[in-house]
Amino acid sequence: MSKKKILCYVLLTAMLVSMFVAGEVSVAAEQQKPAYSNLADVKSRKEVRSALLSAGISAKTADAWLKDVVSYNKTIKNTSLVKKNFKKMGKKPPVYNENRISKLWLKKNKLFIGYNCRITAYDLMKDYIKVGNTGKANPSQLFMDRDALKNAPTKKFSGKQRKAFESIFSTVQTKYTKNVATHAAIWAKDWKNKKISVSCDTQASLISVVLHSSFSKTENELFVGHTGVLVPTKNHKYLFIEKLSFQLPYQVTRFESKEQLNDYLMGMYDTEWGQDTAK
């Protein structure tokens, strides 16, 4: 049976769980278009590093992550990347030369498939997310994440952090319904059972795209299909930090508002219509 997926959005910040629902928000006409960077130049890296530190992310964590970014960009020879600063987005998301990027990546990395969105987001947020009960995790969908961590050039997480990572991004059993509130309540209950908490000592937020997969009326799951970290800037805007996929680039996008971010994510990942799944 085919796997049906549709999206709901979860904003996880300072122990608050709230759902973004498609159609409830839209980008105001007077707002500037989002602009994105792949951190291929020193200036953009300094800007993002400053925003991370201001949000409470440690210099050690930020610098280690930026080292990963520089290494990745060098490996793919800056293919399809924004070479300097930030570039305004068009009506459609940026397009990357996946074929050339993949060839360049595989030329250097035989076993390591790269870091993805979940590994990147948790790496930045790991000091502020605590999991009290890791025994209830269902990491069945994280087989590629596990492979990436196993074959990474350096050990990314400690044993305790690895268990926390798998708990946070665990598959959650849900009901056969299109009601987003029902799925949100089930997701919140799962976090409560796992004793997952997000510290108030950071202004950074973990933003996750939660997929509802329906195999049948009795087999339904929720899973974080994409995630990133949102940090505020000094001029009251937001930077959304994400790794697009294992082999695709790091991307940092500047948004005028959280509503603009929601519209961006819906445009990227809301790809099904008329399915028996929640939106």
How should these model regions be labeled?
Residues 23, 27-279:
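Cysteine-nucleophile amide-bond enzymes
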Residues 4-25:
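Sec-dependent N-terminal signal peptides of Gram-positive bacterial secreted proteins and lipoproteins
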